[in-house]
Amino acid sequence: MAQQEAEILRPLANFSPSLWGDQFIKNDSDAKVRYIFHYVDYTNLSMLTATGTKMVDTMNLIDTLERLGVSYHFEHEIEEILQQFFNLNTDYNDEAYDLYTVATHFRLFRQHGHRITCADIFGRWRDENGKFHEGLKDDAKGLLSLYEASYLRTRGETILDEALDFTTASLKSIAPNLESPLRRQVEHALVQQLHWGNPRIEARNFISLYEEYEDKDESLLRFAKLDYNLLQMMHKEELHEVSRWWKELDLVAKLPYARDRVVECFFWAMGVYHEPQYSRARVMLTKTIAMTSIIDDTYDAYGTIEELDIFTEAIERWNVEEMKRLPEYIKPFYKALLELYEQFEEELAKEGRSYATHYAIESLKELVRSYHVEAKWFIQGYLPPFEEYLKNALITCTYCYHTTTSLLGVESAVREDFEWLSKKPKMLVAGLLICRVIDDIATYEVEKDRGQIATGIESYMRDNGATKEEAITKFFEIANDAWKDINEECMRPSPHSRDVLMRILNLERIIDVTYKGNEDGYTQPEKVLKPHIIALFVDPIQI
């Protein structure tokens, strides 16, 4: 058997080991201790509802609460206030409203799904030729606010396309001459756009900026720090739970060809939802992502076509009896996968939601079928036309499956939501496009070095007679247009709750963070994800 195995030519990728070892399995005292915080009641919440408070002041407070990562405590109050303000139909052409105020209000309304138009309210900052006034370069706060607002644009909103180009160039030119904390905020925004960022990472960054504000609210700052640390302790305990589960499965030893990335998987899940009420959902999603990663590597970096034929059939039949036919190395994984979903079904049945596991399993079967197609392309040296490639690759990007499994632990997600996702709605397809093309850009060179020719970049280059640089430019255009579609689909009215829509949005934000700088931060987390993981799960904020 050993000799036969040695003769099998496998497409091994030689992935680097985990950066973390057993660090998060050791549930040290810091993670277990419940600090006896004198947990501050943030009394300035009264500002949100106080009679006579100016709309501008209330909107600025809402923006600060959201940036500090504590707005979830006041979610219902904020929604009610924004609806009331939106219903006022404020005339933003009034000279009383400066660029900073108008752009901030526009962004906040759009972030919460309100259909505020852009052409009417930003027009007064353009000249007779339709160009933004050069004098705006003296208004750094206004430029930054407009820059951030432009990322909430939808298709056809050319004024925001132009605003993004103008503010990006202007902020880059003036940033070196600004004073902190504004300079730091501008420099960070140019690297990581607020709307595309992981809310938890952005909160930690803004807390450090807010500390430098001359007009900061000291009680609010302390509240944000305490809240961050308390949530961090919860996240560390969850990470301990999934790390222990992963260790007990022992798949790292049994399947050494696969990536050992359970910590990074939890980072992804935390990016989808960080609030306390999603604790169960985070754990469930982490487990499904970790198992998917094993499947991905089995198809991409180990299995022979004969083995993958059998494994694909076994997933399709979803029966423990299929283990008898499977190659020995994959049997423990198959058994663990079935048992995981049995546990999910048993738990969700208690709340009348066992149907959710059916949708997740069917989505996984679809994913595995597409992995199988991709593996055959690789083994056969086949480069499909771009349209054929993309149809399959939108599934193998895994986000269709992960969007479905992200709702497993969300009690408010009902059958209609899962049915909606199963039909590949516009918002989901937009998310799949972002994931696919950004992943393709980041992994192109590595896959090329491994002899993989069936890549999106290669397919597009051949079909369009394009250079690599032209293909990459096109892929970024596809992603930008897809973001516009997501922004549109987040607008009200929607038959689906914000609770569901935000899962799709946050999954796309994880892509932007993970593949920042065209790096594959999941496969090689040292440069991109490691600093974030330390900030989120290791180092508390000093009070």
UniProtKB/Swiss-Prot annotation:
Subcellular location: Plastid, Chloroplast
Residues reported to bind Mg(2+) 2: 296, 300
Binding site for Mg(2+) 1: 296, 300
Keywords of this entry: Chloroplast, Lyase, Magnesium, Metal-binding, Plastid
A Pfam family assignment: Terpene_synth_C
GO biological process entries: diterpenoid biosynthetic process; green leaf volatile biosynthetic process; sesquiterpene biosynthetic process
Cofactors, names only: Mg(2+); Mn(2+)
Pathway(s) the chain acts in: Secondary metabolite biosynthesis; terpenoid biosynthesis
Catalytic activity entry: (2E,6E)-farnesyl diphosphate = germacrene A + diphosphate; (2E,6E)-farnesyl diphosphate = (1S,2S,4R)-beta-elemene + diphosphate
Stretches assigned to coiled coil: none
GO terms of molecular function: beta-elemene synthase activity; germacrene-A synthase activity; lyase activity; magnesium ion binding; terpene synthase activity
Motif (DDXXD motif): 296-300
CC annotations in GO: chloroplast
Binding site for Mg(2+) 3: 439, 447
Tissue distribution of the protein: Barely detectable in leaves.
Keyword Chloroplast: yes
InterPro entries named among the record's database cross-references: Isoprenoid_synthase_dom_sf (IPR008949), Terpene_cyclase-like_1_C (IPR034741), Terpene_cyclase_plant_C1 (IPR044814), Terpene_synth_N (IPR001906), Terpene_synth_N_sf (IPR036965), Terpene_synthase-like (IPR050148), Terpene_synthase_metal-bd (IPR005630), Terpenoid_cyclase/PrenylTrfase (IPR008930)
Task of the protein: Sesquiterpene synthase involved in the biosynthesis of volatile compounds widely used in aromatherapy and folk medicine, and present in culinary herbs. Mediates the conversion of (2E,6E)-farnesyl diphosphate (FPP) into germacrene A and beta-elemene. Not able to use (2E)-geranyl diphosphate (GPP) as substrate.
Family: Belongs to the terpene synthase family. Tpsa subfamily.
Name under which the protein is recorded: Germacrene A synthase
Gene that this polypeptide is encoded by: GEAS
